[in-house]
Amino acid sequence: MEGWRGAWYVPCLASHETLQELCRKENLRCKSIGITNKSLKSYEVEYLCDYKVEEGKEYYLVKWKGWPESSNTWEPQKNLKCPKLLENFLSDKDEYLSRMKEGRALKVRNSVKALKPAVADYIVKKAKQRIALQRWKEELNRKKNHKGMILVENTVDLEGPPIDFYYINEYKPAPGINVINGITTGCECSDCPAEKCCPKEAGFILAYNKQKKLKIQPGLPIYECNSFCRCGPDCPNRIVQKGTQYSLCIFRTNNGRGWGVKTLQKIKTNSFVMEYVGEVITSEEAERRGQFYDNQGNTYLFDLDYDSDEFTVDAARYGNVSHFVNHSCDPNLQVFNVFIDNLDLRLPRIALFSTRTIKAGEELTFDYQMKGSIDLTSDSADGLSSSRKRIRTVCKCGAVCCRGYLN
């Protein structure tokens, strides 16, 4: 599958452990899979796999970093210098016992002489998940081009990073779709906003107040200053283009809604939070994909119908943090169309702004059908394609005003 800007995404068929073993045999270094000069010459504990007591001594089965599982060894507890990994081991063990209702969570030491295979298996899976999520977090933060950090958290189940999802920062046009930035001129303002600033030239008012917070009603478009404008980066009409300013966390929900997104910082009312990006496809292609997504119960198609219903944004495989934002019938985010370097009315950028003050630790949500505060008769993004939905999806948002279904 062709990637972004001509790159190619080719899935690796070999496991992480197999690649490590091959690198060792060929004496190759590969930092991304933990094979470095240091790991080739020394042993570092990656995680603990099992526990036993022999002749009164405690032993832990150690998975060595950069070495295949076939090289695991039993090591006495006194030799281990990894308190955090030991803490993870004990915590995962207690968590499993508690969930399985095998009695109260017991302390390993002085309690048992060996773990049951099911317990050890869970501990290994949890350790592998923790490593996979850490790698995913690092990958997301390498690829994102905005200020805010992205964290990843799963304290609910053993689900790891999504398969076949590629992080992008802007629209990815599907083959045959040309997104041309037609801007050749910009405003001459030295102190925006002025009489002939970008929004006024387009026939609209400036979207932001002096505090750089949104002041327009849902349904109205946002026209920001562009790359040809005379004003500098501190211009109050450059907000969405600066990207997400908040640190966010992709987390596993505990009520069957899969992944979600929460903010790690307080967000004030009418603040820009993030863009909704994905693959830009035709409405015909969206119709075809929609049938497949219906059967899966997923909703990633966002119609762009500000001027026409020609294009749709599909964030199923290509997207950013917004891919993981859940629906709510009482959301704290609102969708707005934004035009910056591309004034093609068929291809507005989709920005999510806060509708109220959002506390640190609170989940971010938007209404997939955008009912409520938005004027549905106005020219606005149409939301995650309701017209294509043939199979009704039960809503689990839990809001008092919940409509019962996502579509």
Swiss-Prot record:
<dbReference type="InterPro" id="IPR050973">
    <property type="entry name" value="H3K9_Histone-Lys_N-MTase"/>
</dbReference>
<keyword id="KW-0156">Chromatin regulator</keyword>
<feature type="binding site">
    <location>
        <begin position="257"/>
        <end position="259"/>
    </location>
    <ligand>
        <name>S-adenosyl-L-methionine</name>
    </ligand>
</feature>
<feature type="domain" description="Chromo">
    <location>
        <begin position="43"/>
        <end position="101"/>
    </location>
</feature>
<dbReference type="InterPro" id="IPR000953">
    <property type="entry name" value="Chromo/chromo_shadow_dom"/>
</dbReference>
<feature type="binding site">
    <location>
        <position position="187"/>
    </location>
    <ligand>
        <name>Zn(2+) 2</name>
    </ligand>
</feature>
<dbReference type="GO" id="GO:0000775">
    <property type="term" value="C:chromosome, centromeric region"/>
</dbReference>
<dbReference type="GO" id="GO:0140949">
    <property type="term" value="F:histone H3K9 trimethyltransferase activity"/>
</dbReference>
<dbReference type="GO" id="GO:0071456">
    <property type="term" value="P:cellular response to hypoxia"/>
</dbReference>
<feature type="binding site">
    <location>
        <position position="229"/>
    </location>
    <ligand>
        <name>Zn(2+) 2</name>
    </ligand>
</feature>
<feature type="binding site">
    <location>
        <position position="231"/>
    </location>
    <ligand>
        <name>Zn(2+) 3</name>
    </ligand>
</feature>
<feature type="binding site">
    <location>
        <position position="395"/>
    </location>
    <ligand>
        <name>Zn(2+) 4</name>
    </ligand>
</feature>
<keyword id="KW-0862">Zinc</keyword>
<feature type="binding site">
    <location>
        <position position="192"/>
    </location>
    <ligand>
        <name>Zn(2+) 3</name>
    </ligand>
</feature>
<dbReference type="GO" id="GO:0008270">
    <property type="term" value="F:zinc ion binding"/>
</dbReference>
<feature type="binding site">
    <location>
        <position position="198"/>
    </location>
    <ligand>
        <name>Zn(2+) 1</name>
    </ligand>
</feature>
<keyword id="KW-0949">S-adenosyl-L-methionine</keyword>
<dbReference type="Pfam" id="PF00856">
    <property type="entry name" value="SET"/>
</dbReference>
<feature type="binding site">
    <location>
        <position position="192"/>
    </location>
    <ligand>
        <name>Zn(2+) 1</name>
    </ligand>
</feature>
<dbReference type="GO" id="GO:0030154">
    <property type="term" value="P:cell differentiation"/>
</dbReference>
<keyword id="KW-0808">Transferase</keyword>
<keyword id="KW-0678">Repressor</keyword>
<feature type="binding site">
    <location>
        <position position="225"/>
    </location>
    <ligand>
        <name>Zn(2+) 2</name>
    </ligand>
</feature>
<feature type="binding site">
    <location>
        <position position="189"/>
    </location>
    <ligand>
        <name>Zn(2+) 1</name>
    </ligand>
</feature>
<dbReference type="InterPro" id="IPR001214">
    <property type="entry name" value="SET_dom"/>
</dbReference>
<feature type="binding site">
    <location>
        <position position="329"/>
    </location>
    <ligand>
        <name>Zn(2+) 4</name>
    </ligand>
</feature>
<feature type="binding site">
    <location>
        <position position="402"/>
    </location>
    <ligand>
        <name>Zn(2+) 4</name>
    </ligand>
</feature>
<feature type="binding site">
    <location>
        <position position="198"/>
    </location>
    <ligand>
        <name>Zn(2+) 2</name>
    </ligand>
</feature>
<feature type="binding site">
    <location>
        <position position="197"/>
    </location>
    <ligand>
        <name>Zn(2+) 1</name>
    </ligand>
</feature>
<dbReference type="GO" id="GO:0044725">
    <property type="term" value="P:epigenetic programming in the zygotic pronuclei"/>
</dbReference>
<dbReference type="GO" id="GO:0000785">
    <property type="term" value="C:chromatin"/>
</dbReference>
<keyword id="KW-0805">Transcription regulation</keyword>
<dbReference type="InterPro" id="IPR016197">
    <property type="entry name" value="Chromo-like_dom_sf"/>
</dbReference>
<feature type="domain" description="SET">
    <location>
        <begin position="246"/>
        <end position="369"/>
    </location>
</feature>
<keyword id="KW-0539">Nucleus</keyword>
<dbReference type="InterPro" id="IPR023780">
    <property type="entry name" value="Chromo_domain"/>
</dbReference>
<feature type="binding site">
    <location>
        <position position="397"/>
    </location>
    <ligand>
        <name>Zn(2+) 4</name>
    </ligand>
</feature>
<keyword id="KW-0804">Transcription</keyword>
<keyword id="KW-0131">Cell cycle</keyword>
<keyword id="KW-0158">Chromosome</keyword>
<dbReference type="GO" id="GO:0032259">
    <property type="term" value="P:methylation"/>
</dbReference>
<feature type="domain" description="Pre-SET">
    <location>
        <begin position="185"/>
        <end position="243"/>
    </location>
</feature>
